Every structure is written in C-alpha cells, then in structure tokens.
C-alpha cells in the first residue's frame, strides 16, 4: 500500500492506473476506521481493480459549536487496517493541501438538508459537498462507496453527482452492525458501559417503525410515538434529537407510502450523538 500526502503525487498515481485501463474504487473517510469502513473497502476490492481510500478530517463540515480538534484521529491504526483490507493508495492530506487558500467560490446545498442533521448542523453539508468535489476531482473514481448509516449525506452526495455530471457510480452499502444491532460508529467509543448496553434500542425502535409501515400503517404520529416509547424504555440517553419519517431521497413529507421512505433517528448520550436509519422501498445501488 502506498501512503500519499500531496495532490500531485496522487494525480500521477491515479493517471498511471487509468492509462493501464484499471477501474478505480474510492472510499472517502474521516479516519478512525472501523469495520463499517472496511466493509466499504471490501466491496470496492471486489468491484474495481484499484482501491483508493482518503483519510481527511474536513474542517469545513464542522460547525462553530463542534470541536474539530477533538475528532478522534489515529493514522497508524488507520494505515494498518487499510493495508490489511487491501487498499492500494491511502491518501492522507493536510488541511493546507486540500484548502491551500480561502475559497473563491462556495457550494451551497439547497435541497434534502432542511431537516434532520441538515437542520441541526447549518453549513455541514455545504462542507461535505465542497470537500467531496475536490476529492472526486483528485481521485477520478469509477465507483465511490458510502454507508447507508449516513443516509442524508448519501442523498446529498447523490444530488451533487447528478447536478454536476460527475461520471461516478455511487455504491450505497448496508449499515454494518455490532452483534446486538448497534450501528458501527467511531463515536461508539464515547459511550459509557451502561449507554453501550442500552444503545441497541435505537435500531430496535427503527425496526418497529419498519414493521408498522410494511403492515400498512400510515399514521405518522402513531409510528413515531411507538418508536419513541421503545427508545425511552432504556433511559440512559439524554434526549432524542430526532425520530422522523421522510420520503427518500427527497427528505420531504411522506405522501406516497409505496415509494422510498427513510425512518431516521438521532439519540444523544452523555458524550456521543448516535444516528441510525432504516430505508423502505429503496433499492441500494
């Protein structure tokens, strides 16, 4: 595995693979890798000839009340997992490499962000599409791999790729879970022992919501209340940041229960905010 830190070296390495008619699979991450990330790598390994992973904690997607400096980082750990997983290039740029000067033009997401994390984290998805536009141009992948757990981000990135004609096939991979159903996340390390024991209730509640919808229930308030009651059976969380249903990928109110729907949850614990979701009537690409 080659570790690359600057743009020019990356572009030259990618060009060499393109000239050899190799397909490129790309897994963008913010590091602190876990099994969920490595599942994305596994799919990329199977479906493309050459796998690129980036590890970059992107400052433009952190809000004023979010601690960019406190985000967990462990490059040695990430490099070890990436190499073991079959990554060919690990791109680990500095902030200065990606943002050498103040941006003269800025991207602004106008749809799919007025609810959930988009509502709570103003400007967050603007930062996501900004950095991905830069990284997509540098890596020039055939396939890019994202996890379903970040479903709103996936919807936003899908819009970016469609709007700006990126010749990239987005591959959306099912959420990787612990044995008890908790979605794998870098933030799980912040849970106390009691919180970790109770956190799987988030997924249990989402499955209850799925079951109700698939059995024909269309009373949104009832569905949300059933899920809320389920989560509140385990009292270690501080609050439920959101628990909601929307059309997917539009993130508008549900009007047709036979089309794509997302049930999304965010639950705040003492030192971690966990998100999870279930997609209904949605085909992953």
Swiss-Prot record:
Active site: 37 (proton donor)
Positions annotated to bind beta-alanine: 61
Protein name per Swiss-Prot or TrEMBL: Pantothenate synthetase
Binding positions for ATP per the UniProt entry: 30-37, 147-150, 176, 184-187
Cellular compartment(s): Cytoplasm
Main location: cytoplasm
EC numbers, comma separated: 6.3.2.1
CDD domains named in the record: PanC (cd00560)
Additional remark text: The reaction proceeds by a bi uni uni bi ping pong mechanism.
Gene designation: panC
GO cellular component: cytosol
Annotated residues for binding of (R)-pantoate: 61, 153
Function summary: Catalyzes the condensation of pantoate with beta-alanine in an ATP-dependent reaction via a pantoyl-adenylate intermediate.
């Amino acid at each position: 595995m080659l570790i690359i830190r600057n743009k020019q070296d990356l572009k030259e390495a990618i060009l060499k693979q393109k000239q050899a008619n190799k397909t490129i699979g790309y897994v963008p991450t913010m590091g602190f890798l876990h099994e969920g990330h490595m599942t994305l790598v596994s799919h990329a390994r199977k479906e493309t000839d050459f796998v690129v992973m980036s590890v970059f904690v992107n400052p433009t997607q952190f809000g004023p009340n979010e601690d960019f400096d406190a985000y967990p980082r462990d490059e040695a750990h990430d490099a070890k997992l990436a190499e073991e997983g079959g990554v060919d290039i690990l791109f680990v740029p500095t902030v200065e490499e990606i943002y050498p000067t103040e941006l003269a033009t800025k991207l602004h997401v106008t749809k799919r962000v007025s609810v959930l994390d988009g509502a709570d984290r103003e400007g967050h998805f603007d930062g996501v599409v900004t950095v991905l536009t830069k990284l997509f141009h540098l890596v020039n992948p055939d396939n890019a791999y994202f996890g379903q757990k970040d479903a709103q981000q996936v919807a936003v990135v899908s819009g970016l790729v469609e709007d700006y004609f990126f010749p990239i096939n987005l591959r959306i991979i099912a959420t990787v879970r612990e044995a008890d159903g908790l979605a794998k996340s870098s933030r799980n390390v912040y849970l106390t022992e009691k919180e970790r024991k109770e956190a799987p209730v988030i997924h249990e509640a989402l499955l209850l919501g799925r079951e109700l919808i698939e059995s024909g229930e269309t009373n949104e308030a009832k569905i949300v209340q059933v899920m809320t009651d389920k989560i509140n059976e385990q009292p270690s969380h501080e609050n439920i940041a959101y628990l909601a249903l929307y059309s997917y990928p539009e993130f508008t109110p549900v009007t047709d229960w036979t089309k794509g729907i997302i049930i999304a949850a965010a639950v705040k614990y003492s030192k971690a905010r966990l998100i999870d979701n279930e997609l209904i009537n949605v085909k992953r690409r």
